[in-house]
UniProtKB/Swiss-Prot annotation:
Domain of life: Eukaryota
Outcome of substituting K153R: Loss of acetylation, kept nuclear localization
Tissue and organ distribution: High levels found in the brain, heart and lung while lower levels are seen in the liver, kidney and skeletal muscle.
Record-given protein name: Protein max
Annotated stretches, region: Disordered: 1-40, 103-160
Biased composition (Acidic residues): 1-13
Gene that encodes it: MAX
GO biological process: negative regulation of transcription by RNA polymerase II; positive regulation of DNA-templated transcription; positive regulation of transcription by RNA polymerase II; regulation of transcription by RNA polymerase II
Residues with PTM N6-acetyllysine: K66, K153, K154
Post-translational modification: Reversible lysine acetylation might regulate the nuclear-cytoplasmic shuttling of specific Max complexes.
GO terms for cellular component: chromatin; dendrite; Mad-Max complex; MLL1 complex; Myc-Max complex; nucleoplasm; nucleus; protein-DNA complex
Length: 160
């Protein structure tokens, strides 16, 4: 943020040349006071934006130090959250792949039930493993599955 952001300051060059030296000095002092007030307000705004400084009286150096610490902390936190999002996306893709494989195994098991074989209780899934007709195509035990089917949730993708 530069000194010129959000502030309208008249320059000395915009004034007519016929002003006295005292008028020029007064005008220059007013512009300088306005610039200093803007800087002061900006430091107060920055101080109030940093949680560890809110409402405290702090020097400009302390405000800058704490603001720097807070920005670094938030960057680390954002990086960690982005890693979590990436991990969840990978996990979601893996789970969706497993769901598709199980649905495919279930549909192939249902097709095989239409063609009676010598043993109607065992079928072969897409991986070539033998499964029970009562298994639903799952390679895991039924003890680990929830009693109610969980609805699939889509991961909301945000533009980054």
């Amino acid at each position: 943020m530069s000194d010129n952001d959000d502030i309208e300051v008249e320059s000395d060059e915009e004034q007519p040349r016929f002003q006295s030296a005292a008028d020029k000095r007064a005008h220059h002092n007013a512009l300088e006071r306005k610039r200093r007030d803007h800087i002061k307000d900006s430091f107060h705004s920055l101080r109030d934006s940093v949680p560890s400084l809110q409402g405290e009286k702090a020097s400009r150096a302390q405000i800058l130090d704490k603001a720097t610490e807070y920005i670094q902390y938030m960057r680390r936190k954002n990086h960690t959250h982005q890693q979590d999002i990436d991990d969840l996306k990978r996990q979601n893709a893996l789970l969706e792949q497993q769901v598709r494989a199980l649905e495919k195994a279930r549909s192939s098991a249902q097709l095989q039930t239409n063609y009676p074989s010598s043993d109607n209780s065992l079928y072969t899934n897409a991986k070539g493993s033998t499964i029970s007709a009562f298994d639903g195509g799952s390679d895991s035990s039924s003890e680990s599955e929830p009693e109610e089917p969980q609805s699939r949730k889509k991961l909301r993708m945000e533009a980054s």
